[in-house]
Amino acid sequence: MSRNAELFERASRSIPGGVNSPVRAFRSVGGTPRFIKRALGPHIWDADGKQYIDYLGSWGPAILGHAHPEVVRAVQDAATGGLSFGAPTEAEVELAELLIQRLPSMEQVRLVSSGTEATMTAIRLARGATGRNKIIKFEGCYHGHSDSLLVKAGSGLLTLGNPSSAGVPPEFVAHTITLDYNNLPAVQTAFAEHGRDIACVIVEPVAGNMNLIKPAAGFLEGLRELCTRHGSVLIFDEVMTGFRVGPQGVQGLTGITPDLTTLAKVIGGGMPVGAFGGRADLMRHIAPLGSVYQAGTLSGNPVAVAAGLATLRLIGQPGFYEDLSARTQRLALGLTERAHAAGVTFSADAIGGMFGLYFRDKVPTSFAEVQTSNTEAFKRFFHAMLDRGVHFAPSAFEAGFVSAAHDDATLQATLDHAEAAFALLKA
């Protein structure tokens, strides 16, 4: 028995399903999860000592590659001064100022410890500020695991084949209106029927939790116009896309200004950090200034903040995103060319440092379309690549990530392995 198998068997006795986040269990692809022992640059090593080129990137945060020396040094330096204080620090002020500087839509920001906390509190803030109850979200978009948002959600719930979670009372989601992503007429109808009670619209401006799906032309602009007209709060969930697709996230690429933005992943540099922020008149409703409560023992944790500051400073260097985008586009195009050469039905898309792989003839534009992907073909491809030392997300419904550490040789090795893997699919 391999060391990975031994650890999974052992973990399954003490941890439900053997993992601490469902998609890690390999349920949708089969086989044994890889237990990671260490990581450096574009590579990870499992418990059996096997090396992989990693396109999971800790589900997005590792934009510089794993264990970047300057980030590690910042964490070590911060840790020597204390791990947690439960009191304000200068570093958390610096991180808040840097986020506000990078994202013009953010006039004020509050740090939390996860993306789920950020989206959960942004929803509460929108309701508290507007005095309204209903929220609009989109099918296949994932905004963390708070109860009111686990309705037709993406990410690991799609991997389970069930876009909603047990244990969520119907009353909790009675005020959640779930619509098709990229279907602006449906949103217009919802506002026509419920506009006076819609507190907010929350959206992944580029969806990354039902694989990668970009917004249709006019979709985000339409959401902005509807929210402005009806006095509702527009929330961009940029937990995944923030600082991953560009220096100002999707809002910078599109020029569309949300009222609130949620962040996590990249802003923590691999440590647990989340944030939400936006218009000052909205943020003034948060305690201790207002009556919308939010708190957290580890919010603004000094070690996590140090990692975030180091990461944001490094990715702010000129040319960083142009280079990252070019690398990601090369991967997506190269995989598509090799799949088609092998006669495999396949498409791919990319934006910034994110990419999507689809075993269907065209890039999907909706939750319904992405569900028509050939998941059996994905499983075979996933394991063929894993056997060759290339680590993709263990789900056909998750985006992938390229880092600054994925150099030309690493990308070429990936494409060479993919050529062999696609050939196996037609064998």
From Swiss-Prot:
It is an enzyme of class 5 (isomerase). It comes from the Bacteria. One of its GO terms (cellular component) is cytoplasm. Its cofactor is pyridoxal 5'-phosphate. It is found in: Cytoplasm. InterPro entries: 4pyrrol_synth_GluAld_NH2Trfase (IPR004639), Aminotrans_3 (IPR005814), Aminotrans_3_PPA_site (IPR049704), PyrdxlP-dep_Trfase (IPR015424), PyrdxlP-dep_Trfase_major (IPR015421), PyrdxlP-dep_Trfase_small (IPR015422). Signal peptide: none annotated. GO terms for biological process: protoporphyrinogen IX biosynthetic process. The modification N6-(pyridoxal phosphate)lysine is found at K265. One of its GO terms (molecular function) is pyridoxal phosphate binding. Pathway: Porphyrin-containing compound metabolism; protoporphyrin-IX biosynthesis; 5-aminolevulinate from L-glutamyl-tRNA(Glu): step 2/2. Keywords: Cytoplasm, Isomerase, Porphyrin biosynthesis, Pyridoxal phosphate. PROSITE patterns: AA_TRANSFER_CLASS_3. It catalyses: (S)-4-amino-5-oxopentanoate = 5-aminolevulinate. HAMAP family: HemL_aminotrans_3 (MF_00375). Homodimer. Belongs to the class-III pyridoxal-phosphate-dependent aminotransferase family. HemL subfamily. This is Glutamate-1-semialdehyde 2,1-aminomutase. It comes from Bordetella avium (strain 197N). The lineage of its organism: Bacteria, Pseudomonadati, Pseudomonadota, Betaproteobacteria, Burkholderiales.
